[in-house]
Structures are given as structure tokens and as C-alpha cells.
């Protein structure tokens, strides 16, 4: 007997295995993202449960390179609701990010340029692993944000005009 299985079920399983857990939409507005990198993140058990429940906030987060390690700061992961206070984690603790040495060295070289920063963009599942996508961003000024908004509005108008014809 063949073990083909249901193709719809396998596609659904793949989609569930690669789902978005938290997104930092404000970062894409405040920064021009020049480069992205997918990293692992060192978590404790209650943090994993909270992230899978969708209780992570990346909005105020940033990354630093200290002692040759990537560190994630100021990301709030709510304490797990079913764990006691003794076993729970600190919501704002510094978390270590897992990346290859050459990737960290490349980021360090780029960060030495003026005005660049590392910001968390999203948390997602890749198989059973929780991954963090970080971005190398350059802060936008107010006039840059306005120009970007005007460009997006013009693109929307062109798209709607083409759809009408």
C-alpha cells in the first residue's frame, strides 16, 4: 500500500510549520531596511509557549553586538499564563541570537557606518524552530516618510486606474 497521503493535508501542515508569530510593522515605516538576516533565538520553555500563543511585542526592540555575540534587547515576551511565578521568565530579559561568525562580522562592519541599526522585523516558525528575522536599517526622517507615503499613494492610484480599464 502506497504512503502518498493527502496532498492538501501536507500543504496545510507546511503552512502551519512556517507561520508568522509576531511582526514589527512599525520598523518598516521608521527605517529603510537595507539587509535582512534570519537568526535563531535562545529561549526558555515559558518564552516558547508565550511566543506560540502570540504574546510577543517586537516594537521597541533592537539588537547589539557585544563580546562577539548578537543580543536582542527590549523585546517584551509576556509571562506564560499557566506557569507559576517561580518558573516564569523575565519579560524584558536580554536574549542571545544565534548566527554564524561570518554573518556577525559582516553586520559589525556594516554597523560601523554612521546611522545604521539592527532591528527585529518578525518572529516566525520554521519547522519546529522559532526564528527571528533582523534587519539592518537606516532611520527615516519625517520628509522621507512623507515621500514614501506619496509614492505608495501614487502606486495605488495607478493600480486602481489599470484595474478599471
Curated annotation (Swiss-Prot):
Keywords: Cytoplasm, RNA-binding
GO MF annotations, alphabetized: RNA binding
Gene3D superfamilies named among the record's database cross-references: 2.40.280.10
Compartment(s) where it occurs, according to its Swiss-Prot or TrEMBL record: Cytoplasm
SUPFAM superfamilies with a match to the protein in the record: Small protein B (SmpB) (SSF74982)
Compositionally biased spans, kind Basic and acidic residues: 145-159
UniProt similarity note: Belongs to the SmpB family.
Described function: Required for rescue of stalled ribosomes mediated by trans-translation. Binds to transfer-messenger RNA (tmRNA), required for stable association of tmRNA with ribosomes. tmRNA and SmpB together mimic tRNA shape, replacing the anticodon stem-loop with SmpB. tmRNA is encoded by the ssrA gene; the 2 termini fold to resemble tRNA(Ala) and it encodes a 'tag peptide', a short internal open reading frame. During trans-translation Ala-aminoacylated tmRNA acts like a tRNA, entering the A-site of stalled ribosomes, displacing the stalled mRNA.
Descriptive protein name: SsrA-binding protein
Organism: Prochlorococcus marinus (strain MIT 9303)
Lineage of origin: Bacteria, Bacillati, Cyanobacteriota, Cyanophyceae, Synechococcales
